[in-house]
Amino acid sequence: MTKINENVAIQFVKGENEKDQPEIRLFRNLDGKNGKAVYKFYKPTTITLTNYKSVQRMFLIDSEGVLSTKKIDLSISEDHVKEVKSTYSWNSEEAFERFMRFASRYANSLSKN
């Protein structure tokens, strides 16, 4: 499992960095303003059967601050959380650029470890 830089993180539980590396897909409208990033975690480490009901946000944390979304879908089996799908949306060029700075920092933190 890839170690993630502590300065850049994704969290579902405040204070606990998610260690599972997500699959990320970007979608952007032709107008350049609206879009979304869909994150899929296939082996989440911070969401368990005991705490999944309290998970209400995904936090994207970097040196500029915190981005967050409430759009989270969980797939649960009898004995574990199978998959987490979370969608971060934006509706302006500035918000897209801010998201891309986070995404770049997150990707760079993975490649350094």
Swiss-Prot record:
It is found in: Cellular thylakoid membrane. The keyword Glycosyltransferase does not apply. Keywords: Membrane, Photosynthesis, Photosystem II, Thylakoid. Its main location: membrane. It is a peripheral membrane protein. One of its GO terms (biological process) is photosynthesis. Transmembrane segments: none annotated. Pfam families: Psb28 (PF03912). One of its GO terms (cellular component) is photosystem II oxygen evolving complex. Belongs to the Psb28 family. Part of the photosystem II complex. It comes from the Bacteria. This is Photosystem II reaction center Psb28 protein.
